[in-house]
Design a protein with these regions (language model features):
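Conserved N-terminal entry element of GNAT/NAT acetyltransferase domains
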Residues: 84-87, 121-145, 149, 292-298, ...
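Acetyl-CoA-dependent GNAT
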Residues: 132, 139-213, 217, 222, ...
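Basic, amphipathic "hinge/linker" alpha-helix immediately C-terminal to the N-terminal HTH DNA-binding motif
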Residues: 39, 75-99
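N-terminal leader segment of winged-helix/HTH proteins
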Residues: 1-26, 146-151
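C-terminal "cap" of GNAT-fold acetyltransferases
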Residues: 139-143, 248-268, 274-319
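Conserved acetyl-CoA pyrophosphate-binding loop and the N-cap/start of the following alpha-helix
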Residues: 51, 225, 229-237
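N-terminal helix-turn-helix DNA-binding core of bacterial DNA-binding proteins
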Residues: 14-55, 60, 66-68, 175-184, ...
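Conserved GNAT acetyl-CoA-binding A-motif
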Residues: 43-44, 213, 235, 241-255
Length: 319
């Protein structure tokens, strides 16, 4: 991996003091590009690039001194600072795009047609896997904006895919208190500070402080990151949380149109059982027995290979 990093940084010119011969290092050029034609608020920019506040402030100050960027309070919220490109900044961004395209062409030009196809395909795989490694899973209060955004997108996709649409009020809606400890929890997946998926756990039949079984709910992945294994990662994380709480079994339900989810569940060891609830949108009910502590690391690796071959992405998993 370190050798790969060295080759890429050298070939891309990332170590040059004047990236693409424009008189500024790669860090400044990247920030200029990320601000984009529409501008961006500083917090979003910092989260997107994973930059330290002090470093980003210095980069923006350097770009502003060159007349490329203007930093000012937002017109809609004076507490929020935004960065926008000046006319010179827009021209510089366009020139960086042109020169980046030229570098890409210079990389591909010496290669044969088959080699080019292999390189582009390999780049896509590396990008997808590196993106997957950057996604973070964290418990989230159902009232948090990230939670509301994820669940809202989840419900909207169900409404678009289900025959006859989807009405949350008919689907055994959860009270927010059902998805926070000790009753349950909600996990939200974030990439560069933005929500890209979620999954919930609700404990049932609690005996002596531990649930006899837990229900997995609201499992969803944003379409732009499907195929990166996030659906299975959320599923395993929820199984582990259920086992840690003392549950012996996890159950879930799903709709017949969500074939991707059904394939994943079966690949991950879920077996179909009779209905355990009266959800009007469910056609299949599944159950899985848990080992104490949840899936072991070796088991997770084997299952990961199996599920990657079985399903390319994870749509909304259940109603």
């Amino acid at each position: 991996m370190r050798r790969f990093n060295r080759v890429v940084t050298q070939r891309a010119g990332a170590l040059d003091d004047a990236f693409l011969a424009r008189g500024r290092p790669l860090g400044q050029a990247r920030v200029l590009w990320e601000i984009g034609p529409e501008g961006v608020d500083i917090r979003t920019l910092r989260n997107r690039l994973g930059l330290d506040s002090g470093y980003l402030s210095r980069v923006l100050a350097a770009l502003a001194a060159d007349g490329l960027v203007v930093v000012r309070p937002s017109e809609t919220d004076r507490r929020v600072r935004t960065a926008r490109l000046t006319r010179a900044g827009l021209a510089e961004r366009a020139e960086l795009d042109r020169r980046n395209d030229a570098v890409a062409s210079s990389i591909l030009e010496p290669l044969g047609e088959a080699q080019r196809a292999r390189l582009v395909e390999a780049m896509a795989v590396v990008e997808r896997l590196l993106t997957a490694s950057m996604i973070r899973l964290q418990p989230c209060d159902p009232r948090h904006p990230h939670a509301r955004s994820s669940l809202g997108s989840y419900f909207a996709e169900l409404a678009a895919r289900f025959d006859g649409g989807f009405d949350i009020d008919r689907a055994n809606p959860d009270d927010p208190s059902d998805l926070v400890p000790p009753a349950g929890l909600l996990l939200v997946a974030t990439l560069n500070g933005e929500p890209v998926g979620c999954g919930a756990l609700r404990h049932h039949d609690v005996r002596r402080g531990a649930p006899h079984w837990s229900e997995i709910k609201r499992l969803w992945v944003v379409p732009t990151v499907r195929g990166a294994g996030l659906g299975r990662r959320l599923l395993v994380a929820l199984e582990q949380r259920a086992a840690a709480a003392g549950a012996r079994t996890v159950r879930l339900d799903t709709n017949r149109v969500l074939t991707e989810a059904i394939t994943m569940y079966r690949a991950e060891g879920y077996r179909e059982i009779p209905a355990f609830n009266d959800n009007p949108y469910a056609h299949h009910w599944f159950e899985k027995r848990l080992a104490p502590g949840g899936p072991r690391r070796g088991q997770a690796r084997v299952a990961s290979t199996r599920s990657t071959n079985a399903v390319s992405g994870t749509a909304p998993a259940q109603a």
